[in-house]
Amino acid sequence: MRPSKRAADEMRAVSFERGISKHAEGSCLVKFGDTHVLCTASLEEKVPGWMRNTGKGWVTAEYGMLPRSTGDRMRREAAAGKQGGRTQEIQRLIGRSLRAVVDMQALGEVQITVDCDVIQADGGTRTAAITGGWVALHECLRWMEARQMVRVEKVLKDHIAAISCGIYEGEPVLDLDYAEDSVAETDSNFVMTGKGGIVEIQGTAEGAPFSEEEFANLMKLARGGIDRLVSLQKMAVA
């Protein structure tokens, strides 16, 4: 039995609140149960130096956790003087995931930075950030379209969403919260497009290795979860 009493293939309640920031071109507060992430998409009419004069744009991401997003206060990374390895890994993952569904030529020579700030953490912050980051990016492109800068459907080729799966007490389960994630035998993150394309899979065994059959079961759970997340994204931006 899962601590939350959810079925093995049941996600936490997921919601998207658009327009949460009056300053950002695109913004979204995404909630996966008790994991809450504020995603903002900011437009800059410039690109990294290595992309100048190419006619192509760029999408990047930054990720951070507020000091009291967790049970005990975390020290701000800025106060420590450097980003931790986990932070760098996650923000690179978010950026890669979003770029997988963006036509950089259609975007034009601008940069969009998607900032993902974890307000409250209860497992799955990176998957929530990717899923909510897509909504914030969509809203930024919609802002640009209203100013005749781009066509959203030309730039954004597909949806992107992410979900965690794991083996908890011997059973494959979908969308782990912290109580499950902290003791799971296997923990995996799946990033997929709306059309079912795989962008990234991260899978780790904690203790004993897992089998191909167990991985296939996790993949099946993930596909079902991604389908539901994409449906929720579609409703959020309609």
Curated annotation (Swiss-Prot):
Its EC number is 2.7.7.56. GO terms for biological process: rRNA catabolic process; rRNA processing; tRNA processing. It is an enzyme of class 2 (transferase). GO terms for molecular function: 3'-5'-RNA exonuclease activity; tRNA binding; tRNA nucleotidyltransferase activity. Phosphate binds at R86, G124, T125, R126. InterPro entries: ExoRNase_PH_dom1, ExoRNase_PH_dom2, ExoRNase_PH_dom2_sf, PNPase/RNase_PH_dom_sf, Ribosomal_Su5_D2-typ_SF, RNase_PH, RNase_PH_bac-type, RNase_PH_CS. PROSITE patterns: RIBONUCLEASE_PH (PS01277). Keywords: Nucleotidyltransferase, RNA-binding, rRNA processing, Transferase, tRNA processing, tRNA-binding. It catalyses: tRNA(n+1) + phosphate = tRNA(n) + a ribonucleoside 5'-diphosphate. Phosphorolytic 3'-5' exoribonuclease that plays an important role in tRNA 3'-end maturation. Removes nucleotide residues following the 3'-CCA terminus of tRNAs; can also add nucleotides to the ends of RNA molecules by using nucleoside diphosphates as substrates, but this may not be physiologically important. Probably plays a role in initiation of 16S rRNA degradation (leading to ribosome degradation) during starvation. Belongs to the RNase PH family. Homohexameric ring arranged as a trimer of dimers. This is Ribonuclease PH. It comes from Brucella anthropi (strain ATCC 49188 / DSM 6882 / CCUG 24695 / JCM 21032 / LMG 3331 / NBRC 15819 / NCTC 12168 / Alc 37) (Ochrobactrum anthropi). The gene is rph.
